Amino acid sequence: MKNKVLLCINTLKSGASILGNDVKVYLETKYFVEVVLIDVGRPLFSFPKENFLFLITLGGDGTVLLAVNLLLENENIDIPIISINMGNVGFLADIKIEDFKKVIDRFFNNSLVINKKFLLHVTVSQHGKDLISKYALNDIIIRSSVLNKMIYVDLMVNSESFLSYKSDGIIVSTPTGSTGYSFSAGGPILEADLEGFXLTPISPHSVYNRSFVFSKLSKLSISFSKEYFIAAASIFLDGINFGSFGVDVVFEFKISSQSLNFVSFCTDTFVKRLKNKLL
């Protein structure tokens, strides 16, 4: 039986199909592996329940997040992730197109450098019963299911009552996700290897409107204030809507003991990459 490689491409990206074929041919002819191709730019109805040597993504950071969601949903998170950038910013997809052969060669020569990226875990419970238990690489967002409605939430840290927010939503982000939506909402940028996570309100209408950074040992609990009523709130994990919930639910956040294995090929420091991509 041949070894298999999972190749996730976003055909909505110009040139992705052509590059995908080049990668596929290179793997099949030089290393005699079977390439399983998935187009994350189109609806996916099934995920191959197989073991893969590694995952390659062709696209931007959005493509990486879609592919990661597939891995997380199918509990297949141990394989190395090679993310080739066809987008703009490229914090997650940071391998240049012209380097894809070198990276593949390094895998088969056992000379890859792996960066562990923390996962954020959330549990949504109602009356003590867990409704969902999910992981995110970038961020988890809670916002009203009704357009133009604010949410009123109470925050607890390690089972201790802390403060309340009135805002358009709440972003809980990992260091990986701190350069995305959280940053746009005024949140802090966390160094990639920092063992912690951040909470940032979206357009807060509260007297206290600042973000917080918590250690990996902290556990956050968010519930809806009993003083104000909203019909429902939605939760988004890495941009994907995982449903709406009534106001009697509790959201619990913590850094997971599990992580994802991203292949590193960039020699730039975090500060240099940040300067080049954001500033």
UniProtKB/Swiss-Prot annotation:
Its cofactor is a divalent metal cation. It is an enzyme of class 2 (transferase). Its EC number is 2.7.1.23. GO terms for biological process: NAD metabolic process; NADP biosynthetic process. It catalyses: NAD(+) + ATP = ADP + NADP(+) + H(+). NAD(+) binds at D61, G62, N138, D139, K149, K166, D168, T179, G180, Y181, S182, F183, S184. It is found in: Cytoplasm. Belongs to the NAD kinase family. Involved in the regulation of the intracellular balance of NAD and NADP, and is a key enzyme in the biosynthesis of NADP. Catalyzes specifically the phosphorylation on 2'-hydroxyl of the adenosine moiety of NAD to yield NADP. This is NAD kinase. It comes from Borreliella burgdorferi (strain ATCC 35210 / DSM 4680 / CIP 102532 / B31).
